[in-house]
Amino acid sequence: MKTTFLDFEQPIAELEAKIEELRFVQDDSAVDISEEISRLAGKSQQLTKDIYANLTPWQVAQIARHPQRPYTLDYVREIFTDFHELHGDRTFADDLSIVGGLARFNGQSCMVIGHQKGRDTKERAMRNFGMPKPEGYRKAKRLMELADKFGLPIFTFVDTPGAFPGIDAEERGQSEAIGHNLYVMAGLKVPLIATIIGEGGSGGALAIAVGDVVQMLQFATYAVISPEGCASILWKTAEKAPEAAEALGLTAHRLKALGLIDKIVSEPLGGAHRDVKGMAAMLKRSLAESLRQFQGVSVKELQARRYERLLAYGKFKETGAQE
């Protein structure tokens, strides 16, 4: 598949186009231009390194939304074996913006749950662009409870603009569904490892991300609102999205510094979409490391750690306060 370049990547796109043109010429020419192709390839790689070393939060947000970025099912194919998808919330419907099911991770049985956006127009409409309705979150809750019953670790993959804000979703109890998930995750007797792989949009992301370990891919985002939404509220125009992205502190490094996530998983040069298999291999290693730390941990200790972790959010200490 031909790589789609973002606006700030246009200098890279121009170099890659020249390289592709030279490769096409070399196929039909007796002249050896392989050295020139290698020189340009090296230049392109260095340019990519330079651009990606100085990304703004708004540019990171664009990478997190890249149309070729790997989604949950891409990672399921690369990381897990024997995946068996489970459907429906047993209450209303089967929301396809949430996928989940039983699988094996390094031979160990587990439960996998994640958002799924869709690749083309038809699939995006079918999956509601990765924005779950209440039945999606209730499906996730059902699968978590099933995993809890059989003592299976849970892996969740977060990639959503947010919970669907439509009237029908509100009528069926969107906020209740999200809140109930938070309650269930807090009391699980099995470890839950959450990974933000793309967009982590507000409560729609949090509804499957109350983890014992929360990690983010290097160019993923996690925030209470989208930059455009924030800009529209504060500045009355979405054109201020770059400033809003800066103010929201939505990048992995900013959130790690604040203690809101535990780990950052590095991405291949140019983002996860440039090397899906390489990205999956790095993520698999990180998931294995995270899961190992719960070996031999009792249910009581697991829940106590989680309780302390949740209570630590939002704590602060005043220094230098005047008497």
Curated annotation (Swiss-Prot):
Record domain CoA carboxyltransferase C-terminal: where: 39-293
InterPro entries per record: Acetyl_CoA_COase_a_su (IPR001095), ClpP/crotonase-like_dom_sf (IPR029045), COA_CT_C (IPR011763)
GO terms under cellular component: acetyl-CoA carboxylase complex
Keywords: ATP-binding, Cytoplasm, Fatty acid biosynthesis, Fatty acid metabolism, Lipid biosynthesis, Lipid metabolism, Nucleotide-binding, Transferase
Catalytic reaction equation(s): N(6)-carboxybiotinyl-L-lysyl-[protein] + acetyl-CoA = N(6)-biotinyl-L-lysyl-[protein] + malonyl-CoA
Main subcellular localisation: cytoplasm
Involved pathway(s): Lipid metabolism; malonyl-CoA biosynthesis; malonyl-CoA from acetyl-CoA: step 1/1
Subcellular location: Cytoplasm
Enzyme class of the recorded protein, top EC level: transferase
SUPFAM superfamilies from the UniProt entry: ClpP/crotonase (SSF52096)
EC numbers, comma separated: 2.1.3.15
GO biological process, alphabetically ordered: fatty acid biosynthetic process; malonyl-CoA biosynthetic process
Any one GO molecular-function label of the UniProt entry: ATP binding
Quaternary structure (record): Acetyl-CoA carboxylase is a heterohexamer composed of biotin carboxyl carrier protein (AccB), biotin carboxylase (AccC) and two subunits each of ACCase subunit alpha (AccA) and ACCase subunit beta (AccD).
Protein name: Acetyl-coenzyme A carboxylase carboxyl transferase subunit alpha
Gene: accA
